[in-house]
Regions:
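Periplasmic-binding protein-like
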Residues: 107-112, 118, 189-227, 249-271, ...
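A ligand-binding cleft/hinge motif common to bilobed small-molecule-binding domains
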Residues: 75, 82-95, 176-196
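N-terminal signal peptide c-region/cleavage motif recognized by signal peptidases
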Residues: 14-18
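Ligand-binding clefts/hinges and TM-proximal coupling segments of bilobed small-molecule sensing domains
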Residues: 140-151, 230-287
């Protein structure tokens, strides 16, 4: 059934797609873009749809576009068919076109806290939501996560600079600094010069934080191709294989399935098509 629906979408969208379509992906800040999961997943989706949509070119922006300019650049078309990955929010959905598929299979929504080594050594017990709410959080100023945590009733301490957030939690200027489960081991390694950092080993926070591919609002047909390709890749297992190559080692090291899970709401995705939820990774599925 899924394959027949996706094939129909592809056939309808093919009429609006041009031959040898160019996609220009947002450059990575941290490493070579071509080595990133976001680049490789997009390439996989485009490869899967070549038979229906024709050849393509996948380029990368010369420099990373600041997130504050994503909407402007996408709709201005100054960069040929600019495409980027980011967490879903109301502004993106209203002003851009998107592929309704969680590119990272929702792993960023699972958050594991960094804590101070002193707090961890003193010990703490969190067995209920009420107990968890007595602890304060640390997040970046202006981050979507900050708003989500505040909306759910947490006291949140904010900082402007990334490194400063690690110093804040180490100095207990807040209790927990939740980071994406797939990112936390890399974060600890990158900021190992900050003394007094530890990874909590008790809890796992979750709020839906899907990351979609976005393009300008006139690129609905091109986005349909990407969504179709991602779903084909998921259906045949090739996307999960790629995802595991990039993230499985990192998430295995933090024992997600052994933690106590606390779920929270994200009101900023209230009006999007929830069919993406079937593709969200569940670390407790086999428990």
């Amino acid at each position: 059934m899924l394959k027949s629906v996706l094939t129909l979408v592809a056939m309808l969208s093919t009429f609006t797609a041009s031959a040898n379509t160019t996609y220009t992906l947002q450059a990575s800040y941290e490493h070579k873009t071509q080595d990133s999961y976001e680049y490789q997943a997009l390439k996989l989706a485009l490869d899967k749809t070549t038979a229906d949509y024709g050849p393509y070119k996948l380029k990368v922006t010369d420099e990373p576009v600041p997130p504050s300019r994503f909407i402007i650049e996408a709709n201005a078309q100054s960069k040929e068919n600019f495409i980027f990955v980011d967490s879903v929010n109301k502004e993106y959905v209203e002003q851009l076109s998107h592929a309704n598929f969680p590119v990272l299979l929702g792993i960023i929504g699972y958050r594991i806290p960094l804590v101070s080594s002193d707090l961890k050594s003193r010990g703490y017990t969190i067995s209920s939501r009420e107990e968890l709410m007595t602890y304060s959080m640390i997040q970046g100023k202006g981050w979507l996560d900050t708003d989500i945590l505040k909306d759910n009733g947490f006291k949140v301490h904010t900082g402007k600079y990334i490194e400063g957030l690690f110093h804040m939690v180490a100095a207990e200027r807040g209790n927990f600094f939740p980071i994406g489960a797939s990112q936390i081991t890399t974060a600890i390694q990158n900021f190992k010069h900050v003394e007094g950092l530890s990874i909590d080993d008790k809890i796992l926070l979750y709020y839906p934080l899907p990351r979609f591919y976005f393009m300008g609002n006139k690129n609905i047909g091109k986005m349909a191709r990407v969504e179709y390709g991602l779903k084909l890749a998921y259906e045949d297992g090739s996307l999960q294989k790629l995802w595991q190559q990039h993230f499985l080692q990192a998430i295995a090291s933090v024992n997600m399935e052994q933690r106590k899970l606390f779920k929270f709401n994200n009101k900023y995705i209230r009006n999007i098509d929830r069919s993406y939820e079937q593709y969200i990774y569940n670390p407790f599925k086999n428990n």
